[in-house]
Amino acid sequence: MPFELFGVDAEIPDRKKHIYVKKQGDPEGDIPACNTTTIPGCMTERGCAFAGAKGVITGAIKDALHVIHSPVGCTAYGYGTKRYPTSQEMPDGSMFPIEKFNLKYITGTDLSESDVVFGGMDKLKRCILEAVREFPEANAVYTYATCTTGLIGDDIDAISREVSEEIGKDVVAINAPGFAGPTQSKGHQVANYTLFEDLVGTAEPPRTTEYDVNLIGEYNIDGDLWVLKKYFEEMGINVLSTFTGDCCHDEIKWMHRAKLSLVRCQRSANYIAKLLEERYGVPYMKVDFFGIEYCRKNLMAIGEYFGIPERAERVIEDRMKKIGPEIQYFKDKLRGKRVWVFSGGPKNWHLPRPLEDELGMEVVAVSTMFEHEDGYEKIKKRVREGTVIVDDPNSLELEEIIEKYRPDIILSGIKEKYLAHKLGVPCILIHSYENGPYIGFEGFLNLARDMYAAIYNPVWDLLEFEEDVN
């Protein structure tokens, strides 16, 4: 059978259907069970729906003020959770007055017991008004329901409409309390639909060209967006709107004027791309810029769509001249090294082929926190026989994967990093990079360089482990 029960899950046999080992000849539909509530007893690594909305989708918007309607814990959780830097430049050429506003500030209602008993809507209104007085530079306000306010039934939509009329600015209510879905993926969906229904089509861009695109699902993690925008600028393509890396609130309003939507993260933002096509006729193309071949193929596809393939070829040729020799050096150093990829969703099927085909590494394990069935089908097609694919792994499973599959390096998030280090395995953050960008040609070189530096760091030779007395 292709499904396996880890030893640490002996008391939770239902975990078996979430752990799949690829074997030749397996039925096409054999994939891990996914997008379901975490099994009680598992120490999950997942985030909540609120994290998916604020931490992924809206938190990257450079000129919006965020008001979390919650006890203080959710507000703290919503702060500084991603490395998505922003520039101060606005689409009309003006400059937003506060540098990295989205990373520096967050506000919350700090609900108390009495607010839970008697309702917190008045407090929410006061908090929004106070925040706007404190930060008049903000061009919009985003308010968020959380588990507590969702359970007591506070109507954040009504308060948002009321305050919007009072202050003359958009106040967008995001109803994605933590319990809204089994993973943060539900928060992505709620935020996509909310921003589309409330904002898209309500304003016009300062200018348009015949090569306007929306870059959707690109959150500018440690500068990824700026790498891609440079490619497009050299091709003569204008990024009209991004969703939502380094974007301003108004950019979302004129997404309907693009000639094409490019969907980068196909788990968190495919919803708005489909809505734009259905209502406004904006076609979309799913793209992948991780690794050399995927980047080359997708730049060519975009160039061919607009009838300018020669421009894409020039960009590709220029970058390959710059990175070719160094990539070969790191391939020689990384060949045969075993890697475990553990990300939220799509990077698990973006990365295996480039790591194996272009760096000579062996992907021994892939695991995700919130991938859906279509994503697991892609993962299954892109990994080799014997690779273990795990949905929603718990903390004890992480240890067993390390002990059983012996990865030389793990590409994961901050929650897994220090556990890996304690077990003597180097780890690179692949969600919110510590040393990116990792996208595009030069980004893939950065990733190769960082993996080399992590694996060959002499500190791993200095670690001492106690013998297992059992």
Swiss-Prot record:
GO terms for biological process: nitrogen fixation. This is Nitrogenase molybdenum-iron protein alpha chain. Tetramer of two alpha and two beta chains. Forms complex with the iron protein (nitrogenase component 2). The keyword Transcription does not apply. Its EC number is 1.18.6.1. It is an enzyme of class 1 (oxidoreductase). SUPFAM superfamilies: Helical backbone' metal receptor. [7Fe-Mo-9S-C-homocitryl] cluster binds at residues 265, 431. It catalyses: N2 + 8 reduced [2Fe-2S]-[ferredoxin] + 16 ATP + 16 H2O = H2 + 8 oxidized [2Fe-2S]-[ferredoxin] + 2 NH4(+) + 16 ADP + 16 phosphate + 6 H(+). The lineage of its organism: Archaea, Methanobacteriati, Methanobacteriota, Methanomada group, Methanobacteria. This molybdenum-iron protein is part of the nitrogenase complex that catalyzes the key enzymatic reactions in nitrogen fixation. It comes from the Archaea. Its cofactor is [8Fe-7S] cluster; [7Fe-Mo-9S-C-homocitryl] cluster. Gene3D superfamilies: Nitrogenase MoFe cofactor biosynthesis protein NifE, C-terminal, Nitrogenase molybdenum iron protein domain.
